[in-house]
């Protein structure tokens, strides 16, 4: 069987979502590890006055592509930016571009999607379902297409606790929903959305389930594969550890925790934190397309790209590793020392949110107003709480994903491909991964220089000393109040002080005897 780089040699690839986190990493990996690929057609829309070519060039100039630039300086010649708007009829392709794509494309990687959990249903259907259907219809016209690779989500069927590598029946017929949305106004759509999505937490998950069914039904005559990643996080190894460039998903919460703003949130400490590194998702996608292209399986291949069943990791551990990582390598100008703790009990959660989030925010804003500055902390906390609501469903529940196809795929790789396209998450060391993830948020999201670490540590130590001093003064004041009113409290106070004095005297005497 040919290797993965050999399979992609001379191939023309069509990629959607190249400006997104996953799409960027896939583009970089494809060009670096399969250097003999012929060309990559990247569907990109105009945005903020930038042409598709300018947007692609901006991506290629980023740090993500540093390694590729060193290894293959001429890689840009293989990338062809094509003006396309996935939400428009026929993808808004020009006739010339459409003809080139139809004649040349061998493999499609469909990574584009709206990943906003609070997206309104109409827009989510437009990009996640209708755009996918239009791309399938375009693929049916392609003369040399070998594989259609669709990137979905492992949570598409989160209404089930055990999820196999199959496409389940949709919650509603996508065609009927699309037809209905055409005559509904926005108010009506918003009113019926909760009833439509039912036991799914948001429109993103709901529409990704519909998209899978569209791919299965409309692409019945195509060679289709679906990869379902769980919570996509920073890179594990490639192109370098800890690569992340956005605030989406856990990254924003990690940064809020590192800044000392996030102190508590709803999560079950024993629930599985099914994080999967972005490079594992990319490697799985490239390998899955290779397998389908070489073996031409009769049925659609679905791959649950998850970690929980093979290398379980829990939210309680996430909190512990976050606290340790950000105390060792703090972010610049943290608000408080990093310490986040998860609660599943409603009473405890609301109590600590009030004590650790709301009250400090109000006090800081009051101080800012008194000094003539603009208050900002309470707005930040409010936005943080809204973001937490969208993630609580995933931090409070666990699922079991069947990964037989992923295991089969791993066994099909030759020794060299297993190294180059590593998908074996059993080798993943979570403490090291979270540490690199935290460092990645510092370097690549917040753009903080590593040379500033000594100053950041000094600032963190200063905050620690202030906290210790404040707590000491608070304890003394409380005890003084009780001592002034109670003989019993005075007796307890003097007893404790006496014990401390005796302990210190004994410690001093023991130290002297040793020498």
UniProtKB/Swiss-Prot annotation:
Subcellular location: Peroxisome membrane
Keyword field: Lipid biosynthesis, Lipid metabolism, Membrane, NADP, Oxidoreductase, Peroxisome, Transmembrane, Transmembrane helix
Reaction equations catalysed: a long-chain fatty acyl-CoA + 2 NADPH + 2 H(+) = a long-chain primary fatty alcohol + 2 NADP(+) + CoA; hexadecanoyl-CoA + 2 NADPH + 2 H(+) = hexadecan-1-ol + 2 NADP(+) + CoA; octadecanoyl-CoA + 2 NADPH + 2 H(+) = octadecan-1-ol + 2 NADP(+) + CoA; (9Z)-octadecenoyl-CoA + 2 NADPH + 2 H(+) = (9Z)-octadecen-1-ol + 2 NADP(+) + CoA
Family from the record: Belongs to the fatty acyl-CoA reductase family.
EC number(s) from the headed UniProt entry: 1.2.1.84
Ranges that cross the membrane: 466-483
Function: Catalyzes the reduction of saturated and unsaturated C16 or C18 fatty acyl-CoA to fatty alcohols. It plays an essential role in the production of ether lipids/plasmalogens which synthesis requires fatty alcohols. In parallel, it is also required for wax monoesters production since fatty alcohols also constitute a substrate for their synthesis.
Gene behind this protein: Far1
Family matches, as InterPro entries: FAR, FAR_C, Far_NAD-bd, NAD(P)-bd_dom_sf
Organism: Rattus norvegicus
SUPFAM superfamilies in UniProt: NAD(P)-binding Rossmann-fold domains
Quaternary structure and interacting proteins, as annotated: Interacts with PEX19; PEX19 mediates the targeting of FAR1 to peroxisomes.
Topology Peroxisomal: residue spans: 484-515
Membrane-topology descriptor: Single-pass membrane protein
The name this protein goes by in its record: Fatty acyl-CoA reductase 1
Necessary and sufficient for PEX19-mediated localization into peroxisome membrane as annotated region, ranges: 451-507
GO cellular component entries: peroxisomal membrane; peroxisome
């Amino acid at each position: 069987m040919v290797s993965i780089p050999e399979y992609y040699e001379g191939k023309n690839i069509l990629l959607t979502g190249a400006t997104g986190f996953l799409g960027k990493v896939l583009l970089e990996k494809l060009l670096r590890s399969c250097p003999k690929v012929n060309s990559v057609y990247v569907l990109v829309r105009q945005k903020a006055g930038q042409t598709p070519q300018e947007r692609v060039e901006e991506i290629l100039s980023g740090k993500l592509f540093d390694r590729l630039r060193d290894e293959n300086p001429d890689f840009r010649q293989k990338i062809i930016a094509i003006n396309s708007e996935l939400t428009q009829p026929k993808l808004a392709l020009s006739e010339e571009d459409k003809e080139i794509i139809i004649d040349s494309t061998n493999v499609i990687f469909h990574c584009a999607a709206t990943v906003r959990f609070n997206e309104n249903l109409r827009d989510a259907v437009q990009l996640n379902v209708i755009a996918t259907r239009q791309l399938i219809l375009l693929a049916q016209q392609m003369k040399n297409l070998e594989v259609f690779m669709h990137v979905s989500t492992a949570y598409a069927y989160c209404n089930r606790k055990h999820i196999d590598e199959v496409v389940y029946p949709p919650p509603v017929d996508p065609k009927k929903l699309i037809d209905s949305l055409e005559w509904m106004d926005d108010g009506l759509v918003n009113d019926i959305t909760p009833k439509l999505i039912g036991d799914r937490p948001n429109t993103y998950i709901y529409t990704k389930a519909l998209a899978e069914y569209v791919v299965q039904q409309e692409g019945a005559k195509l060679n289709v594969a679906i990869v379902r990643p769980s919570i996509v996080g920073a890179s594990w190894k490639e192109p370098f550890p800890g690569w992340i460039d956005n605030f989406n998903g856990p990254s924003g919460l990690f940064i809020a925790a590192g800044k000392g703003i996030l102190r508590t949130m709803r999560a079950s400490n024993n629930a599985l934190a099914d994080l999967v590194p972005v490079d594992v998702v990319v490697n799985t996608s490239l390998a899955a397309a290779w397998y389908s292209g070489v073996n031409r399986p009769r049925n659609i291949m679905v791959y649950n790209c998850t970690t929980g069943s093979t290398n379980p990791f829990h939210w309680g551990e996430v909190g512990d590793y976050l606290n340790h990582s950000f105390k060792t390598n703090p972010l610049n100008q943290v608000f408080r020392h990093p310490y986040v703790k998860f609660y599943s009990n409603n009473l405890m959660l609301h109590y600590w949110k009030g004590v650790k989030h709301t009250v400090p925010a109000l006090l800081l804003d009051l101080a800012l107003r008194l000094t003539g500055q603009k208050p900002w902390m309470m707005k930040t906390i409010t936005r943080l709480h809204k973001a937490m609501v969208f993630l609580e469903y995933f931090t409070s529940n666990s699922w079991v994903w069947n990964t037989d196809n992923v295991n089969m795929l791993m066994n099909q790789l030759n020794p060299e491909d297993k190294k180059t396209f590593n998908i074996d998450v059993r080798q993943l060391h979570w403490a090291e991964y979270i540490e690199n993830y935290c460092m990645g948020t510092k370097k690549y999201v917040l753009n903080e220089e590593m040379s500033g670490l000594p100053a950041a540590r000094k600032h963190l130590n200063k905050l620690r000393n202030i906290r210790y001093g404040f707590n000491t003064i608070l304890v003394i004041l409380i005890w003084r109040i009780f001592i002034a009113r109670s003989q019993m409290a005075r007796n307890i106070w003097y007893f404790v002080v006496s014990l401390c004095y005796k302990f210190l005297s004994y410690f001093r005497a023991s130290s002297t005897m040793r020498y």
